């Protein structure tokens, strides 16, 4: 399913290029409507990191959400994306990845990797904060040659903006 009508407008989507985890969190946060239960979304993007579609995956109870990996895979392929960012919320306010979050992310990376779709990040939003699994080295890369996950360090984001340079006087 595509994100419900509270989603973001097509004009806005065409104008934004998501370059880092913070931009993804700001972009996706408006879709989270129920502060009492976990909700799970996926931002499907093209090679230029421009969102093609926000895809609603599932909602659950206050401390967990279950989802269908096959549905997630079908929706990602149907969007014709080349990469995605996963996003879910933690109503508890804990801005950290649980073991279940890490295992689910790995399963999704394996499934999407088999069809050539890269998972750039899995962000967790709380009412006041956010957590990027990629920025904490928790998003392995899919190796198409072996069909396995590579847990070696990887660049957090392909388009991370340069840090501002100090002007010397």
Predicted regions and their residues:
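Single conserved hydrophobic/aromatic residue that forms the stacking wall/gate
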Residues: 1-12
